[in-house]
Amino acid sequence: MSSENKKEPLLVITGPTATGKSEVGVLVAEKLGGEIISADSMLIYRGMDIGTAKPTSADRRGIPHHMIDIVEPDQDYNVALYRKQAMAVIKKVLERGNLPIVVGGTGLYIEALIRNYSFGGAGTDKTLRKKLQKEAAESPFLLHQRLAKIDPATASQLHPANTRRVIRALEVYYLTGKPISNFKRLDEPDPPFNLLMFGLTMEREALYRRIEKRVDRMIAMGLIEEVQNLLQRGFSPRLNSMRGLGYKEMISYLNGTLSLEEAVEVLKRNTRRFAKRQMTWFRRYKEIRWLKIENFADCEAIAQEIARCTEGVL
């Protein structure tokens, strides 16, 4: 950098699921000489491709993609580890003279990059955790509702079935009196990024139609077979990865709990609810410049607008 005070550029493209973030990100990267850093908590898993809508090699169009396929479905992973690894990747991208472009819809991952949070300072309480685990076993939805009352920002980002993270968020609150979403390291400044954030959005009904078509496409592409393969490889349905959208619903079909038609409808409903939670989370960000998809002819036009907005800024 030519000046000590100059901040390094960071471009973020986010928004709810099924809005075309991945395609737009690649097009922007082509225009600006960028590399993609995924901010999606499901794309980290190897072998989970169809249900996560993981960009294929063709989709990536030769653009480097990072933070994808980095762990097995049964490996533990958390936000703190994501931050450490993604920040190291961003540093290397900048050293190569390229623009780091963060693309994804996992709000906690994005938050971890643009804010300095202390993830371990709250400590743990084994007795409290066991109590919460027992309650979660009886009713994960009631536990999630409790979190929603004390920390709606975090609850909006977590599915009720993700009991491990729901329990951790409640544990932090009970130990500190503060929501985990408020945990910020005050002894150092925010990361030194010249930040530009864009959010893709569209009318709710149009988004829901997109979601339904996407689910139908996943089934046609072999989502059921993908889930069968994961189960045959020995990955437990109780893993956090296997509780992700698309996987838990197909497991319910495979074990006879739901018919295929029911499983597909439940997946569509759960994905719609997930998109709603994502929007609740992202509305907190004053930095986001929202781009309404209906106002553009296609993803290329959206990418052109984002590239135009970076001129003289990044």
From Swiss-Prot:
It holds the Pfam family IPPT. The record marks T106, R129 as: Interaction with substrate tRNA. It comes from the Bacteria. GO terms for molecular function: ATP binding; tRNA dimethylallyltransferase activity. Its cofactor is Mg(2+). The keyword Magnesium applies. Substrate binds at T17, A18, T19, G20, K21, S22. One of its GO terms (biological process) is tRNA modification. It catalyses: adenosine(37) in tRNA + dimethylallyl diphosphate = N(6)-dimethylallyladenosine(37) in tRNA + diphosphate. Residues 40-43 are annotated as: Interaction with substrate tRNA. ATP binds at G15, P16, T17, A18, T19, G20, K21, S22. SUPFAM superfamilies: P-loop containing nucleoside triphosphate hydrolases. Catalyzes the transfer of a dimethylallyl group onto the adenine at position 37 in tRNAs that read codons beginning with uridine, leading to the formation of N6-(dimethylallyl)adenosine (i(6)A). Belongs to the IPP transferase family. This is tRNA dimethylallyltransferase. The gene is miaA.
